[in-house]
């Protein structure tokens, strides 16, 4: 799915696989994944150990005062898509901080919003410190699913072209059924579901950044039927394309 806010997920226990845009990450204890607004993502959980996690969500505007304090470039760099493996010696610190944010989020009193803002600033500073001063904190993508990531990347970069399951199977020299099954297993998305989500993501951008007609945008994003585009857009975004364009709060 896609949403209009930042998601930071920290894994306390268990394992999961996160697919973001066109990359697959395997997360385990102490891993933190950053998902910016508009990124296509889905998580699947596996293993015998129950998954326990913190999920922190916040909107871009909540970062304004933090940007004014430590600089736009630093904040933007620290919140790019990716996974940080928090060193074991620092896990107590971040887990205590996340528990404090959870406590304040339950609305203790009129000071809670200020405590949440201060906690968010502390979390970002902690992440920046880990990124800049710790070795090997960045987690690489899952190499076991390299082929499915290549297929997802191709779709992500060529969404405006005609793309079918048969075409992709031929291009990557695998059977249609194998591609369909493995893609779903690796990403959590069905092949067509992912393709449509990528196209809608780009349609959203064009609706807000251009004055192209909705019909033109549909064709620019790979849809060959503007009615189908409208139906798909409403199904994924919960709003018609023309209303989305008029109402940026719906993003």
Q: What kind of region is each of these model predictions?
A:
Residues 153, 157, 162, 166, ...:
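Terminal helix-turn-helix DNA-binding modules in bacterial transcription factors
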Residues 2-18:
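Short, conserved beta-strand element in jelly-roll/cupin
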Residues 80-90, 105-116, 124-157, 161, ...:
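Short, Lys/Arg-enriched, Trp-marked, Pro/Gly-tolerant hinge/linker segments that flank
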Residues 30, 178-183, 228-229, 233:
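Short hydrophobic/aromatic patch on the recognition helix
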Residues 37-106, 125-134:
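A hydrophobic/aromatic-rich effector-binding and dimerization subdomain
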Residues 22-36:
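Short acidic-glycine-tyrosine-enriched beta hairpin
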Residues 12, 95-109, 152, 156-159, ...:
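Regular secondary-structure segments
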Residues 15-17, 24, 40:
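Structural motif
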